[in-house]
Amino acid sequence: MKSLKAGEETTNFSIILEDGDPALNPANRPRLSEAIEMIIGTANGYQVPFAAIPLLEHQDIPEQNLYKCLFGRDSLLISDLLYGARPDLRLNVLCALASFQGKVIDPISEEEPGCIPHEVRESNDPVAIKLTKQGGWKFPYYGSVDATLIWMRQLHAEALLKPEILDTEVSGISLWRRSLAATEWILNRLSSPSGLIESNRANPRGIENQVWKDSGDSYMHLDGTLARGDSTASVETVGEAYDALLS
């Protein structure tokens, strides 16, 4: 563990990987084709890339399984990056996330009509059980203001290549109708006092910064103090909202 700086203190510390762990040996890294197959899982019947998965040696380490599920922004971006190798994944992710698209207002899960979820887990998932019990969450969890924006952009990219996919029905609703619901969500969020999409969590125990940089210390004021509260608008989200509306 590195030495602490002046004013810092250790609040929690645990060793996850020891020196000599197989994961630290470059020779044990899988080939790209193998790695792609490793991250593929199933969500509501669709084959999708999970945000991250542990190596075989780490299957029983809880911390290594934190992202072994369908994540809104992560799975969308991964499927786009892997389009050349697995072009089927992008539409799969779009449909899988659409099947969980928000229908009602639920402050606990932060679900809102038209919103694409941040994190989708089965009820028996150990991480879901822990976050539900200790964090006051509910799954699917919708605490993300950029997943819907990225979903719109990826749908546009897929439709440019194959316009007919807009008629694809997910749970009885076509993707183009779902894009209208997503657009309504975006316009509603843009009606904030700043005219920008802000985090504004509904669950006080939910994620504070509901964007790519979602750590609690990701945003600061000019004087260096942490930007706490729920009215932070990231510059990335401004650009993503612009792209989504153009889509």
Where are these regions (language model features)?
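Acidic, mature catalytic/reactive cores of soluble proteins
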Residues: M1-S247
